């Protein structure tokens, strides 16, 4: 996983919507496409970007391709971002955090 690929994948609202759709469980590509008013090639491109970033995985089931959320990459990114907020053992600039004097 390249971090920049994950951020690029997450930067698009349509791809974030796909991830939200997959929160409830695996879906066939057709069911994902039915939630959008954009072309099938555009949906396919979005699914490819998400797959290449490691955010979703897919498997073929007969004629269907089933997509599933892959949370491990998301957890890695969230952990990395959370670490960036820590300065001197506490959350920097957190409004509820008392500052040391």
Regions found by a protein language model. Give the residues of each.
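Amphipathic alpha-helical dimerization/coiled-coil segments
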Residues: 1-2, 8, 70-101
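N-terminal helix-turn-helix DNA-binding core of bacterial DNA-binding proteins
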Residues: 2-41, 61-73
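A short linear hydrophobic-aromatic micro-motif
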Residues: 18, 53-56
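Core alpha-helical elements of the protein kinase catalytic domain
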Residues: 20, 47-48
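Alpha-helical residues within the helix-turn-helix
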Residues: 34, 45, 51-52
């Amino acid at each position: 996983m390249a971090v920049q690929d994950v951020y690029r994948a997450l930067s698009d609202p349509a791809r974030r919507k796909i991830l939200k759709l997959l929160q409830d469980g695996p879906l066939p590509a057709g069911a994902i496409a039915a939630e959008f008013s954009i072309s099938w090639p555009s949906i396919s491109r979005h699914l490819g970007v998400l797959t290449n970033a490691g955010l979703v995985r897919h498997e073929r089931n007969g004629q269907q391709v089933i997509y599933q959320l892959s949370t491990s990459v998301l957890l890695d990114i969230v952990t990395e971002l959370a670490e960036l907020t820590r300065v001197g053992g506490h959350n920097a600039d957190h409004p509820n955090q008392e500052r040391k004097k």
